[in-house]
Amino acid sequence: MALTSTQKDFVIYDEEFNSALYERLQVNIDVWNAATYGALVITTDAMKGHFSKVSMYKALASDVVKEYNPENVTTTAFDTFESFEQVKVKVWRDSNIQKTVDAFKVLLLNPDATFSQLVGGLTADLITKDAIETLLSSILGAIENDTSHVLGDGTKFPTFKDINKAQFVYGDQFSNVACILTHSNTAQGIVDLNIDEKLDTVAGFTISTGKWHTLNIPMIIADLDALKDGANYKMAFLTAGAGVCVNSETVSAYTDIDLDSRPAMMRFKREWAYNIGVKGYSYDTTKGNYPTKAVLANKTSWKKVVSDDKELPCVVFKAKAV
């Protein structure tokens, strides 16, 4: 069906759309960033091109402090100070919706202003959910390159010992685990499995307070597709700054009215883009400029650029389904 109208036939009010979009988007971002304790960061910035690159210095592999005797003249050995380049990749998104003009008129609502505000808020929710899914898919895909950070085989739920082991994959940096992100199915399994465990007893009474079933690590329950592993699920122990999603372009909104339809249909198209970065990994630019979520979830799309595994974004435990 051809569209015969033009932009001027239906007006999107910038004030209503943008106020609803950015107010809701800011609320979503603030809540999510706080809830993950800085593990998954969503932010905004303007970035040109397909890739965002940054250079960082690697931690020295050997000691830089050496003892010496000032009375002996010896040859000095210099340690190599190396840097690495991390690449964030830009992904593009769009969304298209339509609604009859009469649907608003019958409620005595202004279709222009009401639709602008409604779609602005819905767009913010859509951007946030897609950003979280894409970012988490990228992190979980990248970490598959390092088997030491992948625990479990999908045959059981994580016990206290498994949760403790996941933390101490980071050795003396175990406190870097900021939160656990898990599917509700896995969360139910953890509680079912550990509900009879006693962390402390006082006069015969069991004391279990706070986040006892995850050893006091904050747990976020989110039924995200990225946490599904076939018929089973993944449980992500995320460190601070595990991933960053930068909303790197202004959200564009385009409108039109389909006059070939009876009744007339309001059509609305939204386009946006953001850059995805994973801690300790660099996107392989040979995989292309327009990666899909499936490409980002593939471990071959990411190259480890840090030499210390304690700088990797997460530990994953593969759990069975309830």
Can you describe what each PLM-predicted range is?
Residues 82-147, 180, 257-280:
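Long, contiguous amphipathic alpha-helices that act as assembly "spine/axial" helices in icosahedral shell
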Residues 103-173, 289-322:
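Alpha-helical scaffold segments that mediate packing/assembly in large oligomeric complexes
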Residues 184-187, 204-267:
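Extended serine/threonine-enriched, polar tracts that run as long, contiguous segments within proteins
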